[in-house]
């Protein structure tokens, strides 16, 4: 990642055009910007231009780590839901023939296809594989169609993944299986604990849609989305 200084004259034009508030708004954002951030990362060929630069706070710029704004390279989707949710059915009508799906459950099955119960070590390995794949694809400059599938929108390194996804304009879909249906299943101890954590978040599609709409309005004001792009994609 390049850390050279942008021409002060270009920076002045960026501030005059787009303002000096952090454009990212990641969890923990300082709001007041102190750094120049490339929408198309410099590593992807992004230029030092008014069109490609926005101001960011140091915290958010470091947290972004060259992840692309969805559509400026890979187009990113996320599907979240409680344990045993039918993730495949939720995505079925939207997947393209070349879509890439990163699913924790699928990775876990691939690691232990002959075991009915995964050990903590295998679950950790699957989680690390998911994180690595998601991180790599989120930085891709190629026009990939990426679907990230998991239950809890958080991890030790990223305690508020949902806010990060919304900041980068991922299309987030919530599977709203009633708690009574999930807890009626023959859940493992780990699944039961995860289900408790999931329902404690009280996530709904309506609430997530409202946050995504507000973010897309902000991106439109920053010249990064057109007015007709601010509505949530139809599922």
Regions found by a protein language model. Name each.
Residues 96-166:
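Conserved nucleotide-sensing/catalytic segment adjacent to the nucleotide-binding pocket
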Residues 110-112, 150-209:
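ATP-dependent NMP and nucleoside kinases share a basic, alpha-helical "lid"
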Residues 1-24, 43, 47, 70-73:
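Short, charged surface segments at domain edges that flank catalytic/cofactor-binding sites
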Residues 26-55, 68, 104-105:
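Histidine-centered nuclease catalytic patch
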Residues 75-96:
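Glycine-rich phosphate-binding P-loop
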Residues 58-70:
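Short metal-binding segments enriched for Cys and/or His
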Residues 72-77, 142-144:
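Pre-Walker A (Motif I) flank of P-loop NTPase domains
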